[in-house]
Each structure stands twice: as structure tokens, then as C-alpha cells.
Amino acid sequence: MSVISIVPLASKPCLYKSFISSTHEPKALRRPISTVGLCRRAKSVTASMSMSSSTALSDDGVQRRIGNHHSNLWDDNFIQSLSSPYGASSYAERAERLIGEVKEIFNRISMANGELVSHVDDLLQHLSMVDNVERLGIDRHFQTEIKVSLDYVYSYWSEKGIGPGRDIVCADLNTTALGFRLLRLHGYTMFPDVFEQFKDQMGRIACSTNQTERQISSILNLFRASLIAFPWEKVMEEAEIFSTAYLKEALQTIPVSSLSREIQYVLDYRWHSDLPRLETRTYIDILRENATNETLDMKTEKLLELAKVEFNIFNSLQQNELKCVSRWWKESGSPDLTFIRHRQVEFYTLVSGIDMEPKRSTFRINFVKICHFVTILDDMYDTFGTIDELRLFTAAVKRWDKSATECLPEYMKGVYIDLYETVNELAREAYKSQGRDTLNYARQALEDYLGSYLKEAEWISTGYIPTFEEYLVNGKVSSAHRIATLQPILMLDVPFPPHVLQEIDFPSKFNDLAGSILRLRGDTRCYQNDRARGEEASCISCYMKDNPGSTEEDALNHINGMIEKQIKELNWELLKPDKNVPISSKKHAFNISRGLHHFYKYRDGYTVANSETRNLVIKTVLEPVPM
């Protein structure tokens, strides 16, 4: 590995967005913006993907901690050079034609005597159509048809489940598991006792020793159903344990195929760390592989064709939005702040991975802006800022006035002004959607977030390790789930009256669980690198302090158990019956939680943009699917 040479950095003014006019010409500045965000390293460092900390001498002569984060991987010139033919009107017209044809398929399987209807498999046909359009990312076009299909299936549901057709007396595991998952996700009341009948005399799920493709598919649907369990559902927990072991064993025995790839994907990403667009890309690839090996039926062929066209049309929009994001990042002056992580492309990948509705560009772009500031503040409070500077910045945010910059060090002034301008701008955007002023919500979330970070900075400066409970209470806020969620969802075309917002925002159980899961999962992936940077307090170290004699493995096992329990509790908060707060109102906040969880699946995919992260950007944003 090469060693980076130590060379003085030339002074270069930071040009923040708030000093750019509407014509993109620099405004006259009353004061110069210092280059204190540029650091001269106090020692040579090895060029690698590690995040070990070193000290740095900033331009104001202050010795500072830095995280040695790798630079932005996505050059703005490269982003601006992206192009796609799929924005042409001919592709939109093709999509409209295919949408009409797929609606006709839905209608034909709903007709009492339609040619596609058989009394022995009509229920399974309805469920398969719903499952396919959702996994292929085209369900937004068929909400009415989905409701009709699920109502039809539910009308035949019994305490023993269902068979593939309405005339089939005996329920089967495949149709029951698929139906259970889809119906529960769409708000129908479902009881897990329906799976008790599939147990043998020993209380285990009964299945033959022959692993046929049909049986494996049944267990795969059982596994998918088990992932939306509630905390008290013992039979669902048993189903998850059984199906996980069964599918892992199946992967060792069946040949590499589209089925094996589907199993591997579902086992890897489960549900709570899955991104809908990644699932869509993966499922398109699976069906494309099937199409090369066998003749697809007419329904699947039409669905696949529409999915590919829709994927690529949105891909064209993604590239245009990403260009806007990259220009905003470049003009904001952020590239000159060398102590921060520049992950605007990764943030955009996350948000476009959870919301593929074309008309929601404002939501996606502003989500990136908020997350970018969260990252600046994270790196400023975690490493670069001194404790006295951070106290000044926290107090300035509470004042929420441009004049508050007078007491700030130079490098913080530009950050403060840009944060102030952006949060106010987003509040104005939210007013258009919500019809009321939401700035106070945003300010309170920001103040709470910075307060939690200041507390952690004080712990670092004093070497204090809190109790596990004290750490987690603070960590739920510093996880940034609330601040990353609140303002963006208020810009959606979805009303969030106060009674709905209080079910999602602080201090709701939903917000508490989402913040806790993110903090716990993040710590299990980051604690070793954080410790190398001098940050001793983590949920692992706090657990070990509370439990003398325990090992890191003990702590990780305990925390992973907490995460699994809290995931089931979050399932309930999302899916519980509530006429006043429908699932659709909570879904975006939940999906943001899924997206953030995704990047901590194996390691910290933000701080170190590893191969999984880069491949995700390529597969879901940069590349279209082959037509």
C-alpha cells in the first residue's frame, strides 16, 4: 500500500450555496470564508479503506482529530456525463400500452368464467399476480386491481388457511404462506395460528425429505411470511428458524439456478434491510434468466416487459435527479471540507431505492440534502470540532438566526449558514404539501439531534463510558433516524396532520424503535473503527461495563437479540390496525428505516463505500436493465 505524502494545502475559499445567486453567480461576500476545513495531517497515513484516526493541524493552528475518510468516489464530471435514451416519449407510450395489457390480465383472472380462471388455482393466480407486480416495482399502476384481488382471496380465507383454488378443500402451505404475507402487509387482519396445522406430531413444520422445486418454493414463502411476525407470535418464530435452516440446506444441494439466486437474495436481505428497487432489479434479472432457459407464460412475459421499460424510464429520471444533487453538492462548497464524508450519491441511491414514484423528485433530492448535513454534523461533532466549538455551534442552532455566526469559528460559519438556508427552504417546500408551517418540527428535531451529539462529544473528551441504558437513550436520537425522516416525509404528497405525525415522530413508539434499531445495528458494524478513532463509548463497551466479565461476543449476541425483538415490535407499529393512521402514512418512514438498515447489513456502508455499496449504485442507479 502506498503512503500519502504530506504537502501543504493551498488556501482556497469555500463557496457555500447561500452565497450563490439564482443565476449561479457568486454573491459579494462581506467576509472571507476560512479554509480551516482543510487540514494538514500531522503524520503520514497509509492509503487504505481503514478508518483509524490521526490528528491534524488545521489552518487556525488547532490540533484536531480526523477520521481519515476516503474521498468521494463519484466525480461530478462523470455524473454530469450520464445519459439515457429512456426519457423519450416513445418509452412512456410503450409503458402505457403494457399497463393496459396487464390490467386486462388482472380483469381476466377476476372474471367468473374467464379463460385464465380455474377453480383449482384461481386464488394462487390472484396472489401470484399481486406478488409479481410488487416485486417488479410496477404495483403503483395497479392499486385498484390489487385491492380487488386481495379482497377476493380474503373472502375465501379460513382459520385453516387456503388452497390454491376456491374449490380446493385442503389448505396448502405455499398458498397460505403467500396469502398471509400479502394480506397482512395490506392491512387485513391475519392470525398466525393458521400455520399450526402444517406441523407434524413433533411440533415441527411437516415436509417431505425430497427437496422438490415446488416444496422449496413453499418454504421460501413461509420464510418471507415469518419476517413480518409480531413479538408474541411463537409459531412465526418457529417458522423462521425452520425455514432458514431448510433454505440454507437447500442451497447446498440444488444446482445454481434462478431459484437458488432468489433464495440467496431473500436470505441475505430478508425484509428489513431490503431496498425495493434492488429487489426489483434482482427479480427482473431472475425472470430474464428464466426467459433464456424456458418459455415464459404470457402473463409473466408481459409483466417482465413492463418492468424493464419502467425500470429504465425511472433510471433516466434518476440520472437527471442525480445531476441536480451533484451540482448542488459541488456549488455548496462541501467538496472543500476535507474532514467530512462525501456520500451524496450513496444517499441518493438509498432514497431512490425506497421510492420509485416519478413525481416525488422533491422528496428524493431534499432527502439527500438533509442526509448530507447530517453527515457534516456527524463528522464535525465526532472528530473535527473541539468541545468548546461544538458548544458554540449547538447554542447558535438554538438561536436560529444568521447573526448567530458571529461567535462561531470560521469553518463553522459557512456550515451554519448553509444549514440554516436549507432547513428553512425545506420547510417552505413542506408548507406546499402540508398547508401549514412545519419549521418548528424541523428545528426541534435538529436541536435534539445536536444535543445528543454534544453529549457524545463530551463523553469522548472526558473518556466517560455511560451505562448501556444511558447510552441507548441518547443513541436513539444521535442515530439521526428522526432528523433524516421528518422533513423529507413532510414534502410528500401525503397529508400528515398532527394526529398522524405523532404516531411517527418523537416520542412515538415507532420513532423510538426505528432509532434504537439503527443505533444498535450501526454500533455492531462500527464500534471497532470508532474505537480506533478514540470513541470508546458504544453499545458494546457499555454492555461490557454493565456486565463485568462479559466478552465482545456476549455483547454482540445480546444486542443482536435486542434488534430481532425490536424488529418484530416495529412490524406491529407499522401494521397494527388503526383507522386513523393507515399503513400508507407510516410506510415512507418505515422504508427509510429499511434503507438505513441496508447500509449496515454487513459493515458501515456509508463511511467505507465498499464493493457492495458501489455495486448497489451501479445496479440501481447508473445502469439500465438490458431490454
Curated annotation (Swiss-Prot):
Q: Name one GO biological process term.
A: monoterpene biosynthetic process
Q: Which residues form a coiled coil?
A: none
**Cell compartments where the protein resides:** Plastid, Chloroplast
Which cofactors does this gene product need? Mg(2+); Mn(2+)
Cofactor remark from the record: Binds 3 Mg(2+) or Mn(2+) ions per subunit.
By its UniProt entry, which SUPFAM superfamilies does this protein fall under?
Terpenoid cyclases/Protein prenyltransferases (SSF48239), Terpenoid synthases (SSF48576)
Q: Does the keyword section mention Lyase?
A: yes
| Broad class of enzyme this protein falls into | lyase
Arranged from A to Z, the UniProt key words for this protein are: Chloroplast, Lyase, Magnesium, Manganese, Metal-binding, Plastid, Transit peptide
Could you say which residues bind Mg(2+) 1 here? Answer: 378, 382
User: Where this protein primarily resides, as one coarse class?
Assistant: plastid
PANTHER family referenced in this protein's UniProt entry, alphabetically = OS04G0344100 PROTEIN-RELATED
Give the family from UniProt: Belongs to the terpene synthase family. Tpsd subfamily.
Q: What else is known?
A: Expressed in both resistant and susceptible trees.
Q: What does this protein do?
A: Terpene synthase (TPS) involved in the biosynthesis of monoterpene natural products included in conifer oleoresin secretions and volatile emissions; these compounds contribute to biotic and abiotic stress defense against herbivores (e.g. insect attack by white pine weevil P.strobi) and pathogens. Catalyzes the conversion of (2E)-geranyl diphosphate (GPP) to (+)-car-3-ene.
Tell me what this protein is called: (+)-3-carene synthase 1, chloroplastic
